[in-house]
Amino acid sequence: MSAHLAMPSYGSVRCGHYYWPSPGSMDSASAAEAPAADLSLTTEQKTPCHPDASPASSSSGTLIQYTPDSATSPTADHPSHRPTFQKVKDKGESGTRKAKSRTAFSQEQLQTLHQRFQSQKYLSPHQIRELAAALGLTYKQVKTWFQNQRMKFKRCQKESQWVDKGIYLPQNGFHQAAYLDMTPTFHQGFPVVTNRNLQAVTSAHQAYSSGQTYGNGQGLYPFMAVEDEGFFGKGGTSCNTQQAMGLLSQQMNFYHGYSTNVDYDSLQAEDTYSFQSTSDSITQFSSSPVRHQYQAPWHTLGTQNGYET
């Protein structure tokens, strides 16, 4: 008795994309059944898959046909990849994205919008609809125009405040400077940095009356800097302008005949403080217009007492 008669007879089993023939008809039916599996793809998908006919559970039979996955076969036809390829192709043919269209307002529309903005910066949704209907525009166009106009108005307002003050926003490490005004008015700012440098930012036009003199305690040059550690002192003490300038006057000895039209270049405050001045009419020190630098020792008011004039 042959081996084919001893084994039980059962038909071929189809499970999805797999074709599992019987052992007896493996040689003869493989060539005929393999094309039939390609034609009846929809019937094979509806046929339930039996677990006892899987290749792992059966020791007899041979795998006849295997349809590869789309991820492993470049020629596989998967319907889910077609729309993506089509989108990429369409995007490649069109090139870059289209720019957003800008609304071209007429002169009458712009005039009406500006007049309304001058009287009312914020509009309610109902007012926006009414204005859009009156101008022949859409709700979004009017709303966007008012938003852009408010941003421009705030930016211009902030810049005008900076120009009026003559300063910009303070950065880290800088303190706001204060100065005194005397008749005639003279404005001079002293930005004080953290390393105790005091730089004098002088103006190009300085107006002093001819009756002002230095050293008498009344017509002193006014300057004062706001700092946490005090004015020209490291011990936390403070002094007024008359005491500071009285000390300068005693060290420099120019009480009489000194011109008041002085161009101050810089005033630096560190461990040793220097005072620089230039003048074209100095007769007491030199006969030619040169630059003089005077070094004056500064002392803390807590230890020095007799410098006030």
From Swiss-Prot:
It comes from the Eukaryota. Residues 25-41 have a biased composition (Low complexity). Pfam families: Homeodomain. Induction: Strongly down-regulated during embryonic stem cell differentiation, induced either by retinoic acid treatment, or by cell adhesion prevention leading to embryoid body formation. Keywords: DNA-binding, Homeobox, Nucleus, Transcription, Transcription regulation. GO terms for biological process: cell differentiation; positive regulation of stem cell population maintenance; regulation of transcription by RNA polymerase II; stem cell population maintenance. It is found in: Nucleus. InterPro entries: Distal-less_Homeobox_TF (IPR050460), HD (IPR001356), Homeobox_CS (IPR017970), Homeodomain-like_sf (IPR009057). Residues 98-157 bind DNA. GO terms for molecular function: DNA-binding transcription factor activity, RNA polymerase II-specific; RNA polymerase II cis-regulatory region sequence-specific DNA binding; transcription cis-regulatory region binding. The keyword DNA-binding applies. Residues 87-96 have a biased composition (Basic and acidic residues). Residues 55-75 have a biased composition (Polar residues). GO terms for cellular component: nucleus. Residues 24-104 are annotated as: Disordered. Coiled coil: none annotated. Belongs to the Nanog homeobox family. Transcription factor required for the maintenance of pluripotency and self-renewal of embryonic stem cells. This is Homeobox protein NANOG.
